[in-house]
Amino acid sequence: MAIKAAYNRRQTISYHVVLAVVLCLLLARPLHAWEVTGYVGMEDLAFIERPLDSRQHMNYVSGVIEAELYHEWDNGSQVFAFVPYFRGAQYDSNRTHFDIRELTWVKAAESWELRLGIREVFWGVTEAVHLVNIINQRDMVENMDGEDKLGQPMINFAFIQDWGTVDLFILPGFREIPFTGVDGRPRPRPPIDVNDAVYDKNGFARQVAYAIRWSHSIGDWDIGLSNFYGTSRDPVILVETDLTGQMLRLIPYYQ
C-alpha cells in the first residue's frame, strides 16, 4: 500500500511540473486568437446475451465531453493546445474517468521542433493494429481495440533534415492500463486486478522512459526506425490460482 501511494504521488508531481512549465510559457505571451472546439456525446453499450457474473448488466449508458483549446502566435512558430477528456459511465466506476489527452507547447523552427507537455504521439503505419505506437498507454476502458490513448508527459525534440526526421523523447511518469471493473462488460473472468500490478523495474527506472525514432518519406514509401527504453506499456497478464487450479484473479505484470 505504501509503494502504491508513493507511486501515485510521483505521478501527480510529474503532471504538476508539466502543467506549471507549460502555463508559464503560455502566460508569457498575449492571449488572443484562441480557437475552442469540442463535442458532447452519449453512448449506450448494449449486449444480446446475459452476463455470466451477476454484478454485470445488459446495457451501460455513458456520456462523453471533450474540448480543445488551441492558440498559436509568433507567426505560427509557437503553438499551445489543451485537450481535456471526461467520460461518465453507468455501473462501471473504472470507466468513469478524466484524462488530459493533450496539454502541450510547441516551438517550431526551420530545422527543429521542441514539444513540451502532455501529448499523444502517433507513429502511423499501415497495419490494422498499430504495434509501433508505444509512446502512449492504451485507454482500454474507452475501446478494447487499443486505438484510444492516454496523454503522456514528455519532452520531445525533433531534428528535421532532408535525409529524415529524428525524434528524441524523454517520458516522465509511467501510466498503467485502465481495465474494465468487476461491474463492467466486456471483461475477462475473473477480472483483471489493477490494484496489485507487478513491475520488473522500480523507482526512477520504472517512472522514466526514453525513445528515439528516425522517419523519412521516399516517394510513396514511409520508412521509420525506432527504439524504446523503459517500462513496457503492454503488460503480461499473470494468472493466480488456488491449490485446485481454479483461477482467482488476473494480475498485470509490467516489464
Where would I find each of the regions flagged by the language model?
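Outer membrane beta-barrel
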Residues: Y70, D74-G184, G219
